[in-house]
A protein has these predicted regions:
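Alpha-helical repeat scaffolds
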Residues: 43-48, 78-85, 113-127, 154-160, ...
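Solenoid-like repeat scaffolds
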Residues: 14-15, 48-55, 69-73, 85-92, ...
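Extended repeat-based scaffolds of very large eukaryotic assembly and lipid-transport proteins
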Residues: 1-66
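Generic helix N-cap/helix-start motif at coil->alpha-helix transitions
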Residues: 18-26, 55-64, 76-77, 91-97, ...
Length: 433
C-alpha cells in the first residue's frame, strides 16, 4: 500500500519487503553457485537479468560473485563469457568484481579457456585496453598481499603488538581523564621502551599500501547468524540491510552517523563493516547514543569529519579501493567461512597471474612490469622478482643500469654469484662510477 495507517504498520511492511528481497537474492546466489554448466537459454536469461534496469547494482554484484564462486568449482565457458561481459559495465563495483573473477578463472583454467577462440579473442582485446591493464595490475598486487602477507601481519598482531600492549599494567583505559592536558610520563617511557610506536607505524604504512591489517581484529567477529548464509559473505555493505537499518539516524546529510562513516570508509571491507554493525547492536543503546553524540559533539570536529567523508566518498569510487575491499572479502570467506574445509582455499596458492599466457601480456606491460618486480623484491620474493627484472631487461630496458643492479643484487642474495658479478659489470658499463 502507498498509504499506511500508522508508522508501525509502515515499518512492518518495509521489513517484510526487505526480507523478501534478501531471500530472493540469496536464492539467486545459491542457484548460480551450485549450477554445473549453463545451457544457452540459461546464459541468455542471466544476461537479461544482468542488463535489467530494474535490478539494483548491489544485487548484480552478488550475482557476479556467485558466477565467480561457481567457476572456482567447475569450469563453464558461458559463465566465463558472462564475466567478460560484466567487466564492460560502467559501475565500478560490478566491473571490479568481474575482473577479479576473470583473473582467477584464467589462473585455474587457462588450458580450458585456450580451447575457445571467442574467449581468447575477447581476452586479447582486453590485454590491449589501458584500463584493463591497470585494473589487472591492482588485482595482482592485492592477491599477492592477501595470499602472502596477511598471515604475516596477523602473526605480528597476535605475537608482538597485542602482547606488548597487554604487558603494561598501568594502561587502564577506563581510568583515563578525558580533560587531562598532560601526558602520563610513565606511559611515554613504556611506549619508548617497548618499541610499540615503531610497530604501529609499520602497520600504518602497511595499511596505506593496501595490506589487510584488520584480519586479526575481525576474524573473531564472524560468528553472527548473518554469516551462516554463504551469499552474505559477498554482500556489499548496505545501511538499509534489515538487521542493521536500526543503527541509522535517518537520511539527514548534515548528520554524521556511524553508518555514514562506514558506508564511505575505504579502510574496512564489506564483511568487516557488517561485523562492526552487529557488534554495535550488541552494545546497550545508551553506549551507542554516546558514541553518536561524540561524533557530532564539537562543530569544528564535525565539519572536519564531513570533509573527510566527502574525500572518502570520492576515493570509494576508485577501482583500486573497490577491488581491494573485494579481495579482502574473498580472503575472509576462504579463511573464516564455517564450511571452508569443504572447498579449495585459493589463497594457499601462489596466484602468480603473470605466468599465465592469457594474462601475461597485460601484467608484463612496460608500464607495470617493473612495479610488479619491485613489489616482489621489497617483500623478499627474490627469485620471482629476479625473473621479472630479467624479463623487463630483455623486453624493454637493456640500457637501464638500475635494473641490472637490482637483478645482480638478487642473484647475489640467492647464491648465484657468477651471474651476480656479470649483472654488476653490465650495470657499471652503462653508468661507470
Amino acid at each position: 500500500p502507498l498509504i499506511y495507517t500508522t508508522e508501525a504498520k509502515r515499518n512492518e511492511e518495509m521489513d517484510a519487503m526487505r526480507k523478501r528481497h534478501e531471500t530472493a537474492v540469496d536464492e539467486l546466489f545459491e542457484k548460480i553457485w551450485v549450477s554445473t554448466r549453463w545451457s544457452e537459454s540459461e546464459y541468455a536469461e542471466a544476461q537479461i537479468l544482468f542488463n535489467s534496469l530494474l535490478i539494483q547494482v548491489n544485487d548484480l554484484s552478488i550475482m557476479v560473485s556467485a558466477v565467480t564462486m561457481s567457476l572456482l568449482q567447475i569450469f563453464d565457458i558461458r559463465k566465463f563469457m558472462f564475466l567478460l561481459n560484466a567487466y564492460t559495465h560502467q559501475d565500478t563495483m560490478l566491473n571490479q568484481r568481474a575482473i577479479a573473477g576473470i583473473a582467477l578463472t584464467c589462473y585455474y583454467y587457462e588450458k580450458r579457456i585456450l580451447q575457445y577462440p571467442e574467449a581468447v579473442s575477447r581476452i586479447n582485446e582486453l590485454n590491449e585496453n589501458t584500463e584493463f591493464i591497470k585494473n589487472l595490475h591492482h588485482i595482482q598486487i592485492q592477491l599477492l598481499q592477501s595470499s602472502r602477507e596477511t598471515r604475516k601481519i596477523d602473526k605480528k598482531m597476535r605475537e608482538e603488538i597485542i602482547p606488548e600492549m597487554m604487558k603494561n599494567p598501568k594502561l587502564n583505559l577506563e581510568g583515563l581523564d578525558e580533560d587531562a592536558e598532560d601526558h602520563n610520563p610513565e606511559w611515554e617511557e613504556w611506549i619508548d621502551r617497548s618499541g610499540i610506536t615503531d610497530k604501529l607505524r609499520e602497520l600504518g604504512e602497511l595499511q596505506m599500501s593496501g595490506a589487510d591489517v584488520y584480519m586479526s581484529t575481525f576474524s573473531q567477529l564472524k560468528q553472527f547468524p548473518f554469516f551462516r548464509k554463504i551469499s552474505h559473505w559477498f554482500y556489499p555493505f548496505d545501511p538499509q540491510y534489515q538487521d542493521i537499518a536500526k543503527l541509522s539516524l535517518g537520511n539527514d546529510e548534515q548528520k554524521i552517523s556511524l553508518l555514514n562513516i562506514l558506508m564511505n570508509s575505504d579502510v574496512f571491507c564489506n564483511s568487516d563493516k557488517y561485523s562492526f554493525c552487529f557488534t554495535m547492536l550488541q552494545m546497550p543503546e545508551s553506549q551507542r547514543n554516546l558514541m553518536q553524540q561524540q561524533l557530532n559533539g564539537q562543530h569544528e570536529a564535525s565539519e572536519e569529519l564531513k570533509e573527510r567523508l566527502k574525500e572518502m566518498s570520492q576515493s570509494k569510487a576508485r577501482a583500486e579501493f573497490v577491488s581491494r575491499q573485494y579481495i579482502h572479502d574473498l580472503y575472509r570467506f576462504f579463511k573464516l567461512w564455517s564450511r571452508r574445509h569443504e572447498i579449495h582455499d585459493i589463497f594457499e596458492d601462489t596466484l602468480d597471474l603473470w605466468n599465465k599466457e592469457t594474462l601475461s601480456q597485460a601484467l608484463l606491460h612496460k608500464d607495470y612490469i617493473n612495479k610488479l618486480a619491485d613489489y616482489l623484491f621489497t617483500h623478499d620474493d627474490l627469485t620471482e622478482a629476479g625473473i621479472l627484472y630479467d624479463k623487463s631487461i630483455e623486453l624493454y630496458n637493456r640500457k637501464n643500469a638500475e635494473l641490472w643492479q637490482k637483478a645482480g643484487f638478487i642473484y647475489q642474495k640467492i647464491g648465484s654469484y657468477k651471474k651476480a658479478i656479470d649483472y654488476y659489470l653490465q650495470s657499471d658499463l652503462l653508468i661507470p662510477d
